[in-house]
A protein has these predicted regions:
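Unchanged
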Residues: 79-169
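Charged, low-complexity, helix/coiled-coil-prone segments
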Residues: 22-40, 75-81, 114-125
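Nudix hydrolase/Nudix homology domain
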Residues: 3-13, 127, 138-199
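Glycine-rich, flexible loop/turn motifs
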Residues: 33, 42, 74, 109, ...
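Conserved Nudix-box catalytic region and its N-terminal flanking loop in Nudix hydrolases
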Residues: 58-98, 199
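N-terminal strand-loop-strand
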Residues: 31, 38-73
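Acidic, metal-coordinating catalytic segment for phosphate/diphosphate chemistry
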Residues: 12-49, 198
């Protein structure tokens, strides 16, 4: 996936949330107008994250970010990698501490798009993330070791998630999760093999 492929994904994506539609339009404009969109050194850059659900779609996996002191889905910087789906899957594996084989891609299409400001930390100034999210599935019985970027990684029932992160983008993703609750099927086998090849 490169800039053109990301543009294709964004162009095909539709949201029923007005603020997210505005994010998508801005993301398309940004990707069209800039080249170094995957580098964290730029004041605005594209990031990737994974919204993790249990197989029954009744729980969401969140990590308590050590630096930001908030609960978020796994995700992070692309660091020059233009394949934003691969970035999301890689970050999910790193931040959960799980082997990639335990992370199953539900859909290779975009699940959510968000644009948000990240506060300055250390030598890193205030900057903006254009975060491209994909939905994945992990078995909720697996031990989740996490890594040093988080204080904890925990499963939460859908009805509890907003107690820990009540921002608008979390609300959107919860609503979308409720929409796929009865769809307990991951992507077809051939696509799953293609997803594994991303690693």
């Amino acid at each position: 996936m490169h800039r053109k492929e990301l543009l294709n994904l964004l162009a095909r994506y539709r949201s029923r949330f007005m603020e997210e539609e505005a994010f998508v339009r801005r993301a398309i404009e940004f990707v069209n107008q800039h080249e170094k969109i995957f580098d964290r050194e730029t004041p605005v850059h594209v990031t990737g994250s994974a919204w993790v659900v249990s197989p029954d779609r009744e729980q969401v996996l969140l990590m308590h970010h050590r630096k930001l002191n908030q609960w978020f889905q796994p995700g992070g910087h692309a660091d020059g990698d233009a394949d934003i789906l691969r970035v999301a899957l890689r970050e999910c594996a790193e931040e959960t501490g799980l082997e990639p084989s335990h992370i199953r891609l539900i859909d290779s299409m975009i699940f959510d798009v968000d644009i948000h400001t990240t506060p300055p930390m250390g030598n890193t100034p205030l900057h903006e993330h254009i975060d491209i999210r994909f939905v994945v599935e992990i078995d909720d019985w697996l031990p989740i070791p996490g890594n040093d970027e988080s204080h904890a990684v925990e499963w939460f029932p859908l009805y509890q998630v907003l107690r820990y992160n009540n921002n608008r983008s979390t609300y959107r993703m919860l609503e979308k999760t409720r929409g796929i609750r009865n769809f307990h099927r991951t992507i077809p086998t051939q696509e799953r093999h293609a997803a594994k090849a991303l690693w």
